[in-house]
Amino acid sequence: MYKKLKLTTISELIKNIYCSLSVLIIGCASAYAVEFNKDLIEAEDRENVNLSQFETDGQLPVGKYSLNALINNKRTPIHLDLQWVLIDNQTAVCLTPEQLTLLGFTDEIIEVAQQNLIDGCYPIEKEKQITTYLDKGKMQLSISAPQAWLKYKDANWTPPELWDHGIAGAFLDYNLYASHYAPHQGDNSQNISSYGQAGVNLGAWRLRTDYQYDQSFNNGKSQANNLDFPRIYLFRPIPAINAKLTIGQYDTESSIFDSFHFSGVSLKSDENMLPPDLRGYAPQITGVAQTNAKVTVSQNNRIIYQENVPPGPFAITNLFNTLQGQLDVKVEEEDGQVTQWQVASNSIPYLTRKGQIRYTTAMGKPTSVGGDSLQQPFFWTGEFSWGWLNNVSLYGGSVLTNRDYQSLAAGVGFNLNSLGSLSFDVTRSDAQLHNQDKETGYSYRANYSKRFESTGSQLTFAGYRFSDKNFVTMNEYINDTNHYTNYQNEKESYIITFNQYLESLRLNTYVSLARNTYWDASSNVNYSLSLSRDFDIGPLKNVSTSLTFSRINWEEDNQDQLYLNISIPWGTSRTLSYGMQRNQDNKISHTASWYDSSDRNKSWSVSASGDNDEFKDMKASLRASYQHNTENGRLYLSGTSQRDSYYSLNASWNGSFTATRHGAAFHDYSGSADSRFMIDADGAEDIPLNNKRAVTNRYGIGVIPSVSSYITTSLSVDTRNLPENVDIENSVITTTLTEGAIGYAKLDTRKSYQIMGVIRLADGSHPPLGISVKDKTSHKELGLVADGGFVYLNGIQDDSKLTLRWGDKSCFIQPPNSSNLTTGTVILPCISQN
């Protein structure tokens, strides 16, 4: 076998050699015809040279060709069948009005094209400000046009006409957890849990069901088990109105009213369909774990996010930006201690561009968590935001029921430019609770956000809300109507966050404060302060230290925590750390740890922690953890042991499985709100995808998880690490998927080999220098004839037949099979077809 040459195509190599000889060619990259001076070519038979295919760059013979298209250097996610027509004795690319629409040209340009069609298409280079360049080797057309002539200005924005709903298929995204806790005295306990989402896609429709399972054991005997399906729903995008339609069990999504679980139908303008700079944000959740702990974020008792975290401060920053309303946070320590609090995910109600409207509406019946029963009352809710002026938006909404509850809200949002963003709204409720008279109440809310560009700081005063005693939310009314009494009548709440990075000091400051008061219950206040700084100590660079103080107030119990951490990088992938923590009992504990991630896909850590007495008595807690990222999922293992006290073991695995009519594959975890992309390598195994984030299985199927929706994404094959004798033609795939889609592409995969040979005609002569050698079936160029008939052929298959054409002559070659191939130069007889 011959080692692959890391080149593009031989034709490009020879072309570049010719282009470098300025005396032979002038303006090689232009679209003008040139004539080669054959006297400067050192060849035995100078006249037997045919370089006609290099004499005109940027042109193709009259006809239709399938090409990739780039518009202002941005790859489009489609192949276009483009025509070349003859104009002024030269061929030029000619686009139909439909193709101009797909490429994102404005209606004005398309109207001009429709008025000047030639054979049903328009030669776009008639517009002086439009230029094209054809890369024949890649069969790729680059179009350069004024940005003002294009509808979409964002480089990552793709016209809805190019969005891909994907193919039919099914998937399961799963998270598995197992734990074992064994105290020195007392009963052992075990727990097995899982949560995730299953789905089926058909066209633009997506069927989804969330699931969560929990099983507890005591000394191996089952104590309790619970299987819930919190949501079963059907949804689809409606690109024509930038909206998402949902039918089934879902949660109301609102920037004004509290969220609740319901069964029915909803329609919401989807800001993910808007350009990226108009999209919202999700909250950051911070806290401190005292041991190896499991952090669970849920809403309406539905698990949204779950993660195992080591001792010390943690931050969850990757929640979906679609979350609205109160989120419940629970930290379960390995010794059974549980800490809970709430955070608000309400963003400042969106400002809307002048003249535009955003909206959401839903109707149905409230549903108990788990979806096993419908509740009263029947409701309809809706809200909107209208861009009244450039910097002023009006918004409002209502909740109407067939019982004794109605709510109406109105507000205004201001873009104060350098002063930040401000919104204010008032909500009125009319409700009659059980055994009470009908009451009218009001709630007032203000939000403010400001980023100080000069200092890089961010201040958010989100969700200040005051409600009088008679104000009733829809959640409170649902609880009262269905005889649930464990709810609190909120009086006042607010959240303040401040973030500041001081570059000169390499110091980052983060402060958050949240307060809730109630008319009929005690108030709670949660706050945290975090300072972190990087510095150098002699040869030790980027040593980091952080100080975190937090107070969590829950059900009249204050939990104060203080944590100091110092981390010393040891090379580029190892870290030595020391942490000191003071808990609510004023006990001080110390932790020393070592973390190693020198292997790209594996990491491990060991630590010892305890207070002064525990270290003195050799009773410090010893912990170890191991994480392994694979193409099929992520494995996490951890264990803790404390002499004469307890030991615990924890394990988790998360991954996904996707199946379509083209095949199926296990793969890395894909977030349930994300799309995914299936690659079919035509049976080729171990094809690395997207920098080895995924690999094709034994059937040639691989799935790239967590592909962003409504954003142009390029997916690639790592051609540098292909298996031996495998070639990929279309190594880059560009796509724009709609939410939840299963994208699909089949690679032009060739299990092939290479040949170095000399082409010999029947009379012993050789074909002219520069002639293309092409595959007879695919017409793909496999090599170019050099001096003396020498040729390097790449991409040969056992059933390949090769053809050569020059002038009125042609011949074909039957190359030897790979099993019969010998080393050295091979004589390749070319049999005349004339």
PLM ranges: what are they?
Residues 163-164, 192-204, 225-239, 376-398, ...:
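Feature captures outer-membrane beta-barrel proteins of Gram-negative bacteria and organelles
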Residues 60-83, 293, 683-693, 762-778:
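Short, ordered, surface-exposed loop/turn motifs in non-cytosolic proteins
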Residues 69, 285-287, 676-681, 753-761:
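A short, amphipathic beta-strand motif
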Residues 23, 27, 31-279, 584-658:
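Post-signal-peptide, soluble extracytosolic/periplasmic N-terminal scaffold domains
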Residues 95, 162-219, 357-430, 453, ...:
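Conserved, compact domain cores that house catalytic/ligand-binding motifs in diverse enzymes
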Residues 149, 178-182, 204, 213-217, ...:
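Transmembrane beta-strands of outer-membrane beta-barrel pores
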Residues 81, 692-701, 778-790:
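Short, acidic Ser/Thr/Gly-rich low-complexity loop/linker segments typical of extracellular
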Residues 86-95, 319-324, 701-727, 738-739, ...:
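Short Pro-Gly-centered beta-turn/loop motif in secreted/extracellular proteins
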